[in-house]
A protein has these predicted regions:
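Short, surface-exposed, charged loop/turn segments at secondary-structure junctions
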Residues: 176-198, 251-254, 549-558, 591-596
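Class I SAM-dependent methyltransferase SAM-binding "motif I" and its flanking Rossmann-like core
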Residues: 181-225
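N-terminal glycine-/serine-/threonine-rich phosphate-binding loop
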Residues: 2-70, 366-367, 374
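ATP/nucleoside-binding phosphotransfer catalytic cores, i.e., glycine-rich phosphate-binding loops
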Residues: 2-12, 223-226, 232-330
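Histidine-anchored nucleotide/phosphate-binding helix
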Residues: 82-93, 390-415, 419
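Glycine-rich N-terminal segment of FAD-binding domains in flavoprotein oxidoreductases
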Residues: 64-92
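Ligand-binding beta-strand-loop-alpha-helix segment within the catalytic cores
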Residues: 19-35, 95-169
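Metal-dependent de-N-acetylase/amidase catalytic core
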Residues: 203-211, 215-220, 312-381, 400-404, ...
């Protein structure tokens, strides 16, 4: 069973010669704008494995010399696969950690001892508890130390690093604001281990571990920039497209305290390891025509023309030969003969992505339409990772499919229970208790007992405490009710609402289990039951460990199994990936764009507002201060404005989709 098919999706088929140059000369040409040696891998797993091999080799070399190997390690998701490979090498290849010394790069402050959401606890779960390291050689900032003792404590932490001969390797991730460790914008080059106040961006990012920003510590004890740069070798890891912009600023931008990771440019043995998604904004990947000759394909040409339009401020059909020649695109003139020929091709390509019939227009010529006319009506399954992703990401298209008489099913893949605040539970408990008092004279003892028990637990609940199974069940019921209300508003029958409650999600914690055969079978059974002609799935591939990606992997794994068995329904099925909750498709990748009128956009907003538990006070709203309906509308309007600026039809908003073809 293949459970990582989403990692094999390559939207732009980047030529290997852009990231795997054949010789040193080609590498120097391609990387001439890059100021830190940067290796690009096809997947996070491949990159992590190479870093793990390098670390393992150093550990062995130090063992032979009878010396310690001193590592500064970060938590978070970026190094997770590196640690997994090191654990595997320990278990299968006998790699010993007896000579390894580990220093935790940072720790939240203040924090209770042994808090489950501490950075040190994450390191223990990912690495330390699974290898034979001497626990006396593991050091972490003390998150309980008295405030008046912090300065001296940080000095001693630095001294302890020096007592082992300094750091051999620092393994870093890059934060959303370009931070390394918790050295945030404004950190000085000569800063050492210290207490630092976390800004809103860092606290928002950390809130994923603590459930809400209110529960997130306001400060951290972190190794300083100078401490990190004292390491003999530094690896900066970044996986996924959400890191792409900060990687570009770190690698290609100037050294600046606004991007602390850029300080690595001053180190003579720093290396950046990224996957293709995180490399997406580097010049040699995003704009290769600026550094080398190109292997042109339709998407790269479309990307180049859109870039040229934005650079010149012209719509497609007004671009001239001069525009191409002056901006590094003369190769396209040689290929097509003139600007006019290129312009017409790309204009028509984009024009053909626009359709008001997302399920196909019946009795119409579908030669240049993104979706087939037949069969009509179609059976459609919309997979929604959380109970509101369907309306946030494709609420306009969903409503259009229903109005055009297609048989629409919505499959809510997870309960979404941990994203409901405790105050919502209390509100519904009051309702249930009041209902019991008014209509049952308080005679239902189960309600009375649960009301008292759950209220008491929530009142005494401390930071880091997990919800009980009863509380998680109530939170799941709240989200089910909201999803049903939204479906009813969009005229989807309630028997077409499927709550899959995939088991991988039900840990009660932010960290989920890997998907299993049980998850895939649940999805597969629904597909066999409905036999859809169209499937819509989440295409948010930015976070390799996010629920959206895991849910999509479950769908793709089920489709792959059906394909292997020769399922007849799959031969007539098209699969479309949507975005919208966290990002939007790049225009060069869009294959279907569904226009939304002002009235339809208002209806979409109303659908999203049915999910009241996900409004202002909801956990996991992310770094974006806008509410989900605001983000969604802004992205949809932005897509329409981009099409308009290129000289295409002007619409109020647009939802965009990319077709997935089973591998």
């Amino acid at each position: 069973m293949k459970t990582n098919l989403s990692s094999q999706i390559t939207l732009n088929r980047v030529s290997p010669r852009y990231y795997r140059p054949e010789n040193a000369f080609e590498r120097s040409v391609l990387t001439r704008l890059e100021k830190i040696p940067t290796d690009i891998y096809e997947s996070a797993e491949e990159g992590a494995n190479q870093i793990a091999l390098d670390i393992a080799q150093l550990i062995r070399d130090k063992q032979k010399a009878g010396r310690f190997c001193v590592l500064a390690l970060a938590g978070g998701n970026s190094p997770r696969n590196v640690y997994a490979d090191l654990v595997r090498m320990h278990q299968e290849e006998g790699l010993s950690f007896r000579n390894v010394v580990i220093f935790n790069l940072y720790e939240y402050y203040p924090l209770a001892p042994n808090a489950i959401n501490s950075n040190f606890n994450a390191l223990k779960e990912m690495l330390i508890d699974h290898v034979d390291i001497d626990k006396q050689n593991v050091f972490t900032p003390d998150s309980t130390i008295a405030k008046d003792a912090i300065f001296e404590y940080c000095r001693l932490y630095e001294q302890r690093i020096e007592s082992f001969g300094g750091l051999d390797i620092a393994l870093l991730g890059i934060g959303r604001v370009g931070n390394i460790g918790f050295n945030e914008p404004g950190s000085r080059l000569n800063s050492t281990t210290r207490l630092i106040l976390l800004d809103n961006d860092s606290r928002n990012e950390a809130s994923k571990m603590f459930g809400s920003i209110e529960n997130t510590p306001i400060s951290s004890i972190t190794m300083g920039v100078a401490t990190i740069l004292s390491a003999k070798k530094i690896y900066l890891l970044a996986w996924g497209e959400e890191k792409a912009q900060k990687v570009k600023e770190c690698v290609e931008g100037p050294v600046t305290d606004t991007i602390p990771a850029s300080y690595l440019q001053t180190h003579n043995n720093a290396h950046v390891a990224i996957d293709l998604s995180a490399a997406a904004n580097l010049t040699r990947i995003q704009r290769p025509w600026l550094v080398t000759s190109c292997e042109w394909n339709d998407k790269l040409i479309r990307s180049a023309i859109v870039w040229l339009c934005q650079l010149t401020g012209k719509p497609i059909l007004k671009l001239t030969n001069k525009d191409y020649n002056e901006n590094g695109l003369s190769e396209l003139l040689a290929l097509f003969g003139s600007a006019y020929n290129v312009n017409i091709k790309i204009f028509n390509d984009l024009q053909h992505t626009i359709t008001g019939w997302p399920g196909g227009k019946p009795n119409a010529d579908d030669t240049y339409r993104p979706e087939r006319a037949k069969p009509y009506p179609k059976r459609v399954v919309v997979f929604s990772p959380h109970p509101d992703d369907d309306v946030i990401s494709m609420g306009g298209t969903l409503r259009r499919l229903v109005e055009q008489k297609h048989d629409v099913h919505v499959a809510y893949e997870t309960s979404g229970n941990i994203a409901v605040g405790d105050e919502e539970v209390i509100r519904f408990l009051h309702f249930i208790n009041g209902f019991n008092q008014i209509f049952n004279n308080s005679e239902d003892q189960v309600i009375n007992d649960k009301y008292t028990e759950i209220r008491k637990y929530l009142k005494e609940k401390k930071d880091g405490d997990m919800d009980t199974r009863d509380i998680l069940t109530i939170k799941g019921l709240i989200r089910r009710g909201e999803a049903r209300t939204a479906c009813t508003y969009n005229n989807i029958p309630l028997d077409h609402c499927h709550f899959l409650d995939l088991p991988f999600y039900e840990t009660g914690k932010i960290q989920k289990n890997p998907i299993s055969e049980a998850d895939v079978e649940i999805v597969r059974n629904l597909l066999r039951e409905v036999k859809p002609h169209q499937i819509f799935v989440a295409g948010d591939l930015a976070d390799p460990h996010g629920t959206h990606r895991v849910c999509t992997d479950a769908v793709f794994a089920a489709i792959d199994l059906e394909k292997e068995e020769g399922a007849k329904w799959l031969k007539e099925c098209r699969i479309w990936m949507y975005r919208g909750a966290w990002a939007e498709w790049e225009i060069e990748n869009i294959e279907m764009a569904v226009p939304i009128s002002p009235e339809e956009l208002r209806a979409k907003r109303n659908s999203i507002l049915k999910h009241q538990s996900q409004m202002e006070s909801a956990p996991f709203l992310g770094n974006d201060e806008r509410l989900f309906w605001q983000r969604s509308e802004d992205r949809n309007r932005g897509t329409a404005a981009l099409y308009d600026s290129l000289g295409l039809a002007s619409y109020e908003a647009m939802e965009a989709f990319v077709e997935y073809i089973p591998l």
